[in-house]
């Protein structure tokens, strides 16, 4: 109202982000279980609908004289009014902080017809109330505190009601060979946290996953400017604790990682990192638990990495040979791939129960 701003962007309209990951509660609604179809409609949807179902960007304009604040010192109660450019229809959107009594006077050029009333509060959203018939181009309405109202001479507003699929855990066990996607597509169910992972062709014509970011971009928030954060992608269930995960890797340059029990966006969890020369580290968060080098490691071919998690015990295998063991802490989290800023490849992800 003060700055006459007429556009709002919601990031993201639908939040499809894994639990525990940064911004997992952003958006107007949540749909982060594509394997089940479950979703949640948050009240933000209906707060938005109080404008979007009562006016359109193309044909409606704000009426400056019919916009204002209940208390200019706090900005906690407001009224905006819009008119259809092609008719006499109008809509008024009201946000209250306290109980209010509002008198509306309808000026020349605006529809003096039945006024439809819709309301939302913390308990119920987008409820149609009794309509109002103006008398002598005027009416009074009592408004409850902490509520949103839309008054309009238009019709057609509605609140959808659908049967939401049941929430289900991420499928377990799980396998992914990346063959069900086109080259250049994003992989199914993966959630990139830095860098970029996409479907690519292998030399034999089959598909794999490739880290394609050649260098770090600009981190627009300081929380991402941590030296241990590198290109990585998550997959699975934040509650996974005891399991075995494996994947094939090809190290084009730098190093790759297979991780498990990883939470959040900052590589917190167990990670096995191996470089093209065969040097490796087992890391938990920022702490190195063990390190070494594999004699005769051939960095020009594919290798299989595997990690077995069982309570406090963590064991790492390279090409089915045990490389290191650790007795550390019990935690839970996702499986992760990570890479230096090279075009490193990943394939044949498998997550299974322990023997």
Task: Give the residues covered by each predicted segment.
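C-terminal beta-strand-rich structural cap/linker in extracellular carbohydrate-active enzymes
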Residues: 132-166
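Secretory/extracellular carbohydrate-interaction modules
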Residues: 204-206, 211-282
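Short, aromatic/His-centered strand-loop micro-motif at the edge of beta-sheets
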Residues: 284-304
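Short, solvent-exposed beta-strand-to-loop segments that form ligand-recognition rims
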Residues: 317-338
